[in-house]
Amino acid sequence: MATKEQMEKVKDIVVKLRYLECMDNIIYYDRWNNCPKDGFDYEGKVGAYLTELSNEKLTSKETKELVESLEGETAFDSDTDKGMVRYLIGKYKEAVQIPASLQGELNQANADGQLAWGKCYEADDFESFKPVLKKQFDLQEKIATAINPDEKPYQVLVNRFDKDYRLEEIDAILAKIKDAVCEILNAVREEQSKIDDSILECEADHDTVLRIVKKAQEILRLDKDKSTLFEIHHPVCVCTGPRDSRPSTNCDELIHAILAVVHETGHGLYNYNANDEVAESGLWGGIEGAMHESQSRFYENHVGRTREFWENLYPYLQKEVPKYKEISLDTFLAALNKVKPGLIRLKADELTNTLHIIIRYEIEKEYFDGKLTVDTIEEAWNRKYQEYLGFTPKNHQEGILQDVHWASGCVGYFQGYALGDAYAAQFAHKLLADCPDAFEKLGKGDSSVIGNWLKEHIHQYGQTYSAREMLKKATGEELNTGYYIEYLKEKYLH
């Protein structure tokens, strides 16, 4: 049994590690939001120093002795205590395995990469981005080798985000989903092509878009005292404390801005909704990877694309954008949910989104298996887009430069979106079993049934459990992709 004294020490270390992470996330937020270009380099150095401080804490004699005394322990007073120990052991092992100099180099590369990506994207210049990409991938491979030299580098990188899965499992899950998506796509492509989605295009000024996306957040009951909205080309959500989560959107296109803010609000709600015990223990913020993406994808698709959600938002949209007064809600929803294969992941329809994810996962895997280089990666990208979606990018912006992930160090992350879709469908199935009137109430303006169910069964626990444990605790089952496939069939074939 872990002693009270041991757990007090664990809590002290974990909480202080989260302080440092919080400061690093504030820098990350600033780089997205306010930092002038000439400030990026210095902020990168500050971030590297915070990593150094974190490593010093993790590799100290005190932490080493504490971890050694608790490793293998199975008896704890609470699940929160067990979660803190698991968290600390995981962080300790990485700190011991990865030299501080290498981690600092990666932090600087992430800052530099984010800035370089922005410049190269604006210039549509992949050639200048190649050295940045190669440096990132080289550093990621060094990180993977440092963590486990006996494992495939890509397996290690994927497990930094989705710790519960072997590549073989992910391959099988994605293959099953891909087959189902392609089958549905082939069945509906012709009929869906007849839907006029040009109505989604509209001239709306910046302030109008901002008012509408804030109204969407209001419907979802995002707490203004625990969040703030910022604007960015590539929407993200930054968690800077247990009661401080900062979703974003891109206000260039109205409907895209709404869906993006609903997606990021899902992250935001998960980030700040840990219960007090979990928050005070340093386990706030949610489980990264697929579990976090399940919450954003749940809100984007299972809420944000539904009639019930738009019964609340559409009248406001019609008031702010007069053209929609002439368009029925039925017509609007058909356009919103139209299956329309395309090149841009962030603008993908719900059905084909997974194909975008699979392309990225396959490319990462092939690169780290030695089958691709930075000189051949774009050709592979374009070939897969033509094969899976029927389009070849005409430029780099709508092709390989569209995502910021690789530039900012998120390598091995993409499978989390697809797994997150499967998790989200499983959560939706259980939510409806527990609360059959949840969406009826949403249609009447009350999203609290949905929000409270997610908080009670998932959000309040933060990082207390692993993703697989959390899924089983919330739904009573292991991952069952059948729920996701049936959801897609019900939506598009019936």
Where are these regions (language model features)?
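A well-structured
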Residues: 2-163, 489-493
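C-terminal, non-catalytic "cap/extension" segments appended to globular domains
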Residues: 2-6, 22-25, 38, 59, ...
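Secondary-structure capping and boundary motifs in well-ordered enzyme cores
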Residues: 42, 105, 132-135, 173, ...
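Contiguous, non-catalytic segments that form substrate-binding/exosite surfaces or channel walls
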Residues: 107-256
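All-alpha helical catalytic cores of prenyl diphosphate-utilizing isoprenoid enzymes
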Residues: 174, 178, 206-210, 216-230, ...
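Acidic/polar loop patches that form or flank catalytic/metal-binding clefts of enzymes
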Residues: 225, 277-281, 305-315, 374-375, ...
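Active-site recognition of the HExxH zinc-binding catalytic motif
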Residues: 253-275, 293-297
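Post-HExxH zinc-binding segment in Zn-dependent metallohydrolases
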Residues: 285-326
